[in-house]
């Protein structure tokens, strides 16, 4: 046990802040769908804490790790969607999670830059978005995924645990690894753990398949953080990065609405 009481105060603050962010976004996602659900909820909390505990250069470098690891999130979502068509939640989420960790481990073997991380995402999404298209048609019955009193607390607690571990370990694992683990898909994982048993694997897979296009906005947002953190400060860079990500989600939402009107 740490003898420093500040450690425990900081830990409680990390958990409380993360839980609050996840609760707010989860409620918003119920009304707005996967475009809001794909926003970096746990990652946002992680970066706020990293900004408090580390200099701007650390945050800027971590953003490259998050950009690269976003490709692993896309692979995670596709893997789960494919496996959930025929398999249960345990096998589907376990294999997808193990694959995420495998891709994350491989990412550490390369010296990534902002440009190469963007290229990686472009290549990965060129495959994951069209391959996920076949899984988007399954309907998600609203009554089968109606929120219970423990759904959001479960998601908030899981995300808070990941954020607390990553930010505490950031002092030892370095900036790139901190950025990689900041985008570990804990919010998506807990969502499908809740939905899969109630609505079925195909319905849960449809949600993650719809998330794929929205995930494209995350590396763009982290790109803004990377270049702006040292120039205008981390807090303004966070605002810019979030604005970029939300702008991308807004574009997708408008495109979707226009298609529905035409149909």
Residue ranges and their predicted role:
Residues 161-199, 205:
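Transmembrane helical segments that form the transport core of multi-pass membrane transport proteins
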Residues 33, 136-176:
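Selected transmembrane alpha-helices and immediately adjacent juxtamembrane segments
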Residues 105-115, 160-171, 218-234:
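Hydrophobic alpha-helical transmembrane segments in multi-pass integral membrane proteins
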Residues 21-33, 74-88, 131-143, 192-203, ...:
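C-terminal ends of transmembrane helices
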Residues 21, 72, 76, 80, ...:
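Alpha-helical transmembrane segments of multipass membrane proteins
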């Amino acid at each position: 046990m740490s003898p420093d009481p500040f450690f425990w105060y900081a830990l409680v603050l990390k958990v409380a802040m993360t839980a609050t962010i996840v609760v707010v976004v989860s409620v918003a996602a119920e009304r707005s769908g996967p475009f809001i659900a794909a926003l970096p909820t746990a990652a946002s909390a992680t970066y706020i804490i990293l900004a408090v505990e580390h200099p701007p250069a650390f945050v800027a470098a971590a953003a490259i790790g998050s950009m690269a690891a976003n490709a692993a999130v896309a692979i995670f979502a596709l893997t789960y969607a494919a496996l959930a068509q025929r398999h249960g939640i345990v096998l589907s989420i376990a294999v997808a999670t193990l694959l995420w960790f495998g891709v994350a481990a491989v990412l550490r073997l390369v010296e990534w830059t902002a440009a190469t991380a963007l290229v990686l995402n472009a290549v990965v999404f060129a495959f994951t978005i069209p391959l996920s298209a076949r899984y988007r048609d399954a309907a998600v019955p609203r009554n089968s995924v109606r929120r219970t009193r423990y759904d959001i607390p479960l998601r908030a607690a899981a995300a808070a645990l990941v954020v607390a571990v990553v930010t505490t370990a950031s002092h030892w694992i370095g900036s790139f690894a901190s950025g990689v683990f900041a985008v570990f898909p804990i919010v998506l994982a807990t969502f499908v753990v809740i939905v899969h048993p109630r609505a079925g694997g195909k319905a849960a897979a449809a949600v993650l398949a719809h998330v794929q296009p929205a995930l494209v906005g995350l590396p763009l947002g982290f790109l803004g953080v990377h270049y702006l953190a040292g120039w205008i400060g981390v807090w303004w860079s966070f605002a810019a990065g979030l604005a970029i990500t939300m702008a991308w989600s807004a574009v997708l939402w408008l495109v979707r609405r226009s298609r529905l009107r035409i149909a």
